[in-house]
A protein has these predicted regions:
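Active-site beta-strand->loop segment that positions catalytic residues and contacts the acyl thioester
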Residues: 26-46
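A signal for specific C-terminal beta-sheet/loop modules enriched in small/flexible residues
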Residues: 14-23, 32-33, 62-70
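Surface-exposed beta-strand edges and their flanking turn/coil or helix-capping segments
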Residues: 4-8, 42-44, 69
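Broad hydrophobic/π-residue packing in well-ordered secondary structure
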Residues: 9-13, 31, 44-46, 52-55
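Hot-dog-fold acyl-thioester-processing enzymes
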Residues: 1-25
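HotDog/MaoC-like acyl-thioester-processing domains
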Residues: 36-37, 46-70
């Protein structure tokens, strides 16, 4: 292991932040920076009429990844 959070782990973590009973039909991810083992991820959720955005951020509020679920 290279001690990085991999893409599948990011998606799994973002999925845990979805509202209950949310059905995913489509997913799109924008990877912004690498997260390493031991980094703290701060999730933010924004719901729209078309879906839900989850941003997993560092301690300064900068995103590691932004995931759009529809």
């Amino acid at each position: 292991t290279n001690h990085h959070v991999n893409n599948a782990q990011f998606i799994s973590l973002a999925g845990e932040c979805l509202p209950k009973n949310f059905t995913v039909h489509r997913m799109r991810a924008e990877y912004k920076q690498q997260a390493h083992l031991g980094d703290v991820l701060h999730p933010l959720r924004a719901e729209t009429e078309n879906g839900c955005f989850i941003s997993l951020n560092d301690e300064k509020g900068q995103p590691y990844v932004v995931v759009e679920f529809q």
